């Protein structure tokens, strides 16, 4: 099935999604990679406020390239999500609902997705130019010293994504190959 979602999202918004479904995501999406995640953990440890509200948020694991004249953003392909695994459950427990990246996630992330009624969506790796076409606006909102890893607020329209982990424990990276092998 294909769904259209607009952020911020609630667990009820995400409940119908199943691993393998496609999503056209619109609204505000925040960018945060490895270093931004580390800074968020440090801020939380110190009791500081994060640069954006986590409740219902979508976080895209991306470090976009510089934009060309007349463009909003350069190439915006996903980075490997596993590097955020140690930090993602905490953000999910604090209200983050959508993670966007590529690659498998660990058992703790999967459990946190189910516990919080969240989802993990895959962006098409190697298609940064395609992903960039969805971005309408961009603003650096935190840690500009991190360069491409600074936290950005993106406004996106119909960003094409695939549900990998759903709120019911579905995992496309496990179910997809199993279904393929069973059909052979």
Segments (PLM) and residue ranges:
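Short, structured beta-strand/loop micro-motifs enriched in basic residues and often containing a Trp
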Residues: 1-9
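Feature captures the catalytic cores and cofactor-binding loops of soluble hydro-lyases/lyases
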Residues: 31-159
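Active-site/ligand-binding-proximal alpha/beta "capping" segment
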Residues: 88, 164-184
């Amino acid at each position: 099935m294909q769904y259209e979602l607009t952020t911020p999202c609630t667990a009820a918004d995400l409940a119908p999604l199943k691993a393998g479904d496609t999503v056209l995501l619109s609204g505000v999406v925040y960018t945060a990679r490895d270093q931004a995640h580390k800074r968020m953990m440090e801020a939380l440890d110190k009791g500081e406020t994060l640069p954006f509200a986590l409740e219902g948020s979508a976080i895209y694991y991306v470090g976009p390239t510089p934009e060309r004249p007349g463009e909003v953003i350069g190439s915006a392909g996903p980075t490997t999500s596993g590097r955020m695994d140690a930090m993602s459950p905490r953000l999910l427990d604090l209200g983050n609902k959508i993670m966007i990246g590529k690659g498998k996630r660990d058992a703790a992330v999967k459990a946190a997705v189910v516990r919080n009624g969240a989802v993990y969506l895959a962006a098409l790796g190697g298609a940064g130019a395609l992903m960039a076409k969805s971005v309408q606006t961009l603003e650096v909102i935190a840690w500009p010293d991190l360069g491409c890893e600074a936290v950005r607020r993106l406004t996106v329209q119909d960003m094409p994504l695939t549900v990998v982990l759903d709120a019911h424990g579905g995992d496309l990276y496990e179910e997809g190959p199993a279904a393929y092998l069973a059909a052979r």
